[in-house]
Amino acid sequence: MRTKSCFAAVRMFAICTLLSSPALSPAFAAPADVPVRLAGAQTSPAQVYGKLFSSQQEEVVAAAEAMPADKYNFAPTNGTFQGVRTFAQQVTHIASSQYYFFTGFGLKPSVDSDAIDKLTSKDEIVKALKDSYAFAHQAVETITPENAFEQFGEHKNTRAGIAAMGLAHTNDHYGQMVVYLRMNGIIPPASRK
């Protein structure tokens, strides 16, 4: 069901485009004493992001599980392109990045995200990936209509913006994982539907 993935990608692009819109910048923001209301919103931001992360998680975890353990050190033309991540490094980068993005929501991870980058076995890496998605889900569940666009932290980010960036970042690396799978003769699980 390639169409489902295509629509998901288009939906993700639209959300990221909307969230990066100048109309959402502080210069266009409502005064602090005016509550933020999403016109006609029937679904909370937490539900929207939760569904997006669940959909992404399904594809990314399936791709991580599809690569055989003996291919986790594969990198395309490793000798020619110095510094290209291996498949394992793509997956650990996604996992550790989830913690990086969402620790700013005030949640404390139960793992050292730097240690994730040192994992070597497929089983450990896939577990770390799944755990990082649990952490991401926990974070996006805290996004409300009232706090979605509030700026916080040193970099004046918003929860909605961080969640969108987390999704976009992982989609980039998922795309690379798909190429690695195909270079090894493996059809990505999302393309098999």
Predicted regions span which residues?
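Bacterial N-terminal signal peptides
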Residues: 11-25
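Short, contiguous alpha-helical
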Residues: 50, 54, 58-61, 73-114, ...
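N-terminal secretory signal peptides that target proteins for export/translocation
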Residues: 1-9
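Solvent-exposed, charged/polar functional surfaces in cytosolic regulatory/catalytic domains
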Residues: 59-62, 66, 135-139, 176
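Short, helix-capping/interhelical loops that line the mouth of catalytic, cofactor-
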Residues: 29-48, 92-155, 184-193
